[in-house]
C-alpha cells in the first residue's frame, strides 16, 4: 500500500567560493568534505584543506602539507582532530585549531580511503587494506591478497565495529571479521561485482545491506549476511532516468541512508551543476527533488546533516553550497529494507570463501 512520506525538498540558503584571499588565486575544486556540528573541512585540488566555521562560513585555518591529491578526510568523533589521506602516500593528523600537523603516517602506496574505529585506522593503500593503531603508532595488520588493484573505499560497519568492508577497481567487495586472527579466516565474503567499484555504504535497520556505485555509474545493493546481490539497477541507469524524467543525468555522486525513515537516497547530477535526488526502492529509482541555481559544474560531494536538516554540496565550480530541506508531502511507496527483500529481483551472485581472484 502507498504511504504518505515527507519528500526531500532542498532549497539553497547560502553558498561560498572556496578560496583564500591571502594565498592569492587558489580557487580550486573541492575534492572531499568532512563535517562536524561546528566545523567543515574542505580538501581542495590544490592540496590544501580549509577549515570553516559552520556558524558563519568563515575560514578558521588552512592546512598545508600534502604534496599530491587529497583523497579523503575524516574527523575523529567529538574532537577537532582531522585525518587526511593522499596520493602522496601519507595520512596526516591535524589539529584544526592550530592548523598544525601532529603526525604523518607514511605508507608504501597511494592512499585512496580511510576510516576510523576508535584508535584503529583502516587505510586503502594501493591494493592493500592496512590497519594502524593511532595510540601505539604502529601497524597492526594488513590484507595484501584480498585485492589485486587499487582499494577505493574502506568502511567499518556502523554497529559491528569488528567488521570491515573494502572495495576496489578489481571489482571485488571484501568483508572482514577482524576478530579472526588468521587472514584467510578473517575474509568472510568476497563478492565479485564485475565492475570497478568507486563508492560503498551501509543501509538497513541493522546496516545489514550495502550499496555500491561503480566507476561506470552502476548502482547495486547487496546482503552482507549472505554476500548475495539483492538488486542491480541496470547497466545504463543514467539513460533510464534521463528518458523517464526528461532531464539529463550525467553521473551519480553517492547514496545517503536515512535511518529514521529507513530510506536510501541517491544523489546525481548533470555537467551544468544541477543536482538530482532519488529515492532507491527495492524495485526502482524514483526522482524526488532537485538541487538548482547554485552550482555550474560537476557536483563532487554531498553531506546530509540530519540534525540541522542541512545538505552541503561541493563542486568543480569551486563553490560550496548549503541547502535547507523544506519537506512537502507526496504519495510515494515507502522503502522498507527489512521486509521487502523477498520482492527484489533475482540475479544474485554467490559469495565466495575461496580465492578472491576467481572471477
From Swiss-Prot:
InterPro entries assigned: WD40/YVTN_repeat-like_dom_sf, WD40_repeat_CS, WD40_repeat_dom_sf, WD40_rpt, WDR89
WD repeats: 23-62, 65-104, 106-144, 146-186, 192-232, 294-333
Top-rank taxon: Eukaryota
Coiled-coil region: none
Keyword Repeat assigned: yes
Sorted UniProt keywords: Repeat, WD repeat
SUPFAM superfamilies membership: WD40 repeat-like
Pfam families hit by this protein: WD40
PANTHER family, per database record: WD REPEAT-CONTAINING PROTEIN 89
Stated name of the protein: WD repeat-containing protein 89 homolog
Gene source species: Dictyostelium discoideum
Amino acid at each position: 500500500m502507498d504511504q504518505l512520506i515527507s519528500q526531500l525538498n532542498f532549497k539553497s540558503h547560502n553558498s561560498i567560493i572556496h578560496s583564500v584571499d591571502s594565498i592569492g588565486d587558489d580557487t580550486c575544486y573541492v575534492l572531499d568534505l568532512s563535517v562536524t556540528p561546528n566545523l567543515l573541512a574542505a580538501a581542495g585540488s590544490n592540496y590544501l584543506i580549509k577549515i570553516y566555521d559552520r556558524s558563519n562560513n568563515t575560514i578558521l585555518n588552512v592546512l598545508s602539507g600534502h604534496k599530491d591529491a587529497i583523497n579523503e578526510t575524516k574527523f575523529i568523533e567529538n574532537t577537532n582532530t582531522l585525518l587526511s589521506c593522499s596520493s602522496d602516500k601519507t595520512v596526516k593528523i591535524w589539529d584544526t585549531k592550530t592548523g598544525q600537523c601532529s603526525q604523518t603516517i607514511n605508507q608504501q602506496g597511494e592512499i585512496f580511503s580511510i576510516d576510523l574505529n576508535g584508535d584503529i585506522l583502516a587505510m586503502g593503500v594501493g591494493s592493500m587494506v592496512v590497519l594502524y593503531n593511532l595510540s601505539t603508532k604502529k601497524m597492526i595488520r594488513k590484507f595484501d591478497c584480498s585485492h589485486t588493484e587499487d582499494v577505493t573505499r574502506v568502511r567499518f560497519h556502523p554497529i559491528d565495529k569488528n567488521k570491515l568492508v573494502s572495495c576496489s577497481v578489481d571489482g571485488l567487495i571484501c568483508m572482514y571479521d577482524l576478530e579472526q586472527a588468521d587472514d584467510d579466516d578473517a575474509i568472510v565474503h568476497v563478492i565479485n561485482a564485475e565492475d570497478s567499484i568507486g563508492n560503498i555504504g551501509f543501509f538497513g535497520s541493522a546496516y545489514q545491506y550495502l550499496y555500491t556505485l561503480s566507476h561506470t555509474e552502476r548502482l547495486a545493493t547487496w546482503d552482507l549476511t549472505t554476500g548475495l546481490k539483492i538488486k542491480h539497477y541496470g547497466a545504463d541507469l543514467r539513460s533510464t532516468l534521463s528518458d523517464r524524467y526528461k532531464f539529463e543525468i550525467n553521473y551519480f555522486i553517492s547514496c545517503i541512508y536515512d535511518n529514521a525513515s529507513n530510506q536510501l537516497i541517491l544523489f546525481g547530477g548533470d555537467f551544468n551543476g544541477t543536482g538530482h535526488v532519488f529515492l532507491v526502492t527495492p524495485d526502482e529509482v524514483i526522482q524526488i527533488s532537485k538541487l538548482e541555481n547554485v552550482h555550474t559544474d560537476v557536483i563532487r560531494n554531498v553531506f546530509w546533516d540530519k540534525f540541522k536538516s542541512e545538505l552541503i554540496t561541493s563542486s568543480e565550480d569551486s563553490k560550496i553550497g548549503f541547502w535547507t530541506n523544506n519537506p512537502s508531502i507526496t504519495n510515494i511507496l515507502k522503502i522498507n529494507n527489512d521486509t521487502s527483500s523477498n520482492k527484489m529481483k533475482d540475479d544474485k551472485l554467490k559469495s565466495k570463501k575461496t580465492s578472491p581472484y576467481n572471477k
